[in-house]
From Swiss-Prot:
Pole-localizer protein involved in the regulation of several cellular processes. Keywords: Coiled coil, Cytoplasm. NCBIfam families: PRK05423.1 (NF003844). It comes from the Bacteria. It comes from Haemophilus ducreyi (strain 35000HP / ATCC 700724). Its main location: cytoplasm. Residues 70-104 form a coiled coil. Belongs to the pole-localizer TmaR family. The keyword Acyltransferase does not apply. This is Pole-localizer protein TmaR. It is found in: Cytoplasm. The keyword Coiled coil applies. Pfam families: DUF496. GO terms for cellular component: cytosol.
Length: 111
């Protein structure tokens, strides 16, 4: 009986270890995916910039293009930050509803 409990406990510890390892690998994979995506975007940005810039352009014209692109990206960042705030608010509301469900007494029926 004692050996069975020890084995059961060990199995649970192994399961927790594997679950944490799986989550760690998932986070690392997601992080690598973000890095790949970011670098692909940088390559695309440089390609786009190369298309806009010609040999006949002055430095001022090139700076104007870069400034315009920067403004566009800053606006996108602001939009994403606003969207994240909205999503955080929704998540907070859902957590509160879930907590309320946990606090609600359960009604047991007898047959």
């Amino acid at each position: 009986m004692v050996d069975t409990k020890k084995q059961s406990f060990q199995n649970m510890l192994d399961y927790v270890h594997l679950y944490r390892l799986k989550n760690k690998l998932h986070r690392e994979t997601a992080d690598n995916d973000r890095k790949i995506r970011d670098n692909q975007k940088r390559v695309l940005l440089l390609d786009n910039l190369t298309q806009y810039i010609t040999d006949a352009m002055s430095i001022e014209e090139i700076r104007a293009i870069i400034a315009h692109m920067r403004d566009d990206y800053e606006n996108r960042v602001d939009d994403y930050m606003i969207r994240n705030a909205e999503l955080s608010k929704q998540r907070r509301e859902i957590r509160q509803k879930m907590a309320a469900h946990k606090q609600a007494p359960t009604v047991k029926t007898t047959d």
